[in-house]
Amino acid sequence: MEEGMEMQPAATRIQRETNPESRQSDDFWLRLDNAAKIYPAVQSEELTSVFRLSAVMKERIRIGPFLKAVNLLEQRFPYYKMKLHKGFFWYYLQYVDENMTVKPDGGAVCRSFEKQELLFRILVQGNKVSVEFSHILADGAGAFEFLKSLLMTYLETCDLIIPSKTAFHRPEEKPAEEEYEDAFSKYVQANLPSPLKIPKSFHLPFDLRTIPRYRALSFLIPVGEIMTTAKTYGVTLTVYLVAVYLYALQRISNKPTLSRKHMRRRIFRIQVPVNLRRMYPSKTMRNFTLFVTPEIDLRLGQYTFEEIIKTVYHHMQLETDRKLINKIISRNVSAERNILLKSTPLFIKSLILHFTYKIAGTSRYSGVITNLGKASFGSGADKHIDYLQFIPPPPNKTLKVNCGVIGFDSKLVLSFGNITTSRELEREFISVLTDDGVHVKHLDG
């Protein structure tokens, strides 16, 4: 921050400087995209559907230029300046002509949004900038593009980088319609067979913490080290991390203290989000992610780490085939377009979605790991950033732990979100990494 300037305890509001004629019309509204429709039916004060992306800079944030950067971006992302509303049949997003606010960071991470709030927030503390988004608005890839635009605009405002043609959503650009399209509906193929149903899976046996339950724990890992380790197995970083996760779960399941109840399910399955923008030519800033679900089946016996690596690799290769992804998109969008479901009142529809999420959703997998990949800002901006951090949304009471990964320059940050009294999964996960020669450092805060 600038010398002598402090963040106020309340939200910091700034005077709009943009031309009133450039403002988005108040009648601008959006249907929830296909992936977002489940969240209003299942979210709560604890299960918030909110995730966090942070950039830790090498110098303290200068609040004056930062607020100016926020002001410059006021009209650039109208599809994020939304509030959730109930219709008779569906929830929808309604544009609100309110200024974005900057708040001091320091409270609980990934907390829920109040009814009067926008569905994203900007937070600052020292040299750290964070944005938190509801999954109703966007996935991690969309939120990262917002954070990138915010940081690039801030650095240009500070004269720390020279304005260039680096690809980011610039303040002076008019938002393109494809930025807020429902890409699932755009790329769906009709009348495809549905994917096969999968059986229920193993879940962690740990007790829940008292409310507020959610806490995050992050670790710093040298990118070069972990990439080299993954390459020794002949796989990508994502495949390697999923294998580590499954191996850690297998170790936990072998503990003599585990009850028979928790060992009834011997299938260990991890949900891995896939950014569909890499498969389809979409520029949407909303949700466009599906999951693949590599697994091991302990009914067949114990797995060596090398066997898990091989199993995960082939699962990922098969399930990320575009034809199989098309089947999942077709199933999801077809359900949304079902005439009976479309004509069902919202309160009944929400009960159906909540039941489906609980019975056919979370019971089918043992964990989630989201890898946002290795990020870069370019244009001289990278040298001003130390590392990035991605904290996943709070898990439900069945799943209990989530994991998020993001890389930047020479540093990878691995974050666990946990609602239990135990840190055993984190310990086993890190133990597998260190056994493989990867150095891991705990990040304070």
Describe these PLM feature segments.
Residues K255-Q271:
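Short, positively charged interaction helices/loops
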Residues E181-V235:
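Flexible, P/S/T/G-rich "lid" or insertion loops adjacent to the active sites of thioester-utilizing
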Residues E2-E179, M227-K231, T238-L258, S363, ...:
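Non-catalytic N-terminal regions of enzymes
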Residues E45-M57, G87-P104, Q116-L118, D207-S218, ...:
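Acyl/amide activation-and-transfer machinery of modular secondary-metabolite enzymes
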Residues Y214-A216, N287-A375, G380:
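Helical lid/core segments from catalytic subdomains that handle acyl or acyl-like groups
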Residues L196-F202, K323-I329, G445:
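Short coil/turn segments at secondary-structure boundaries
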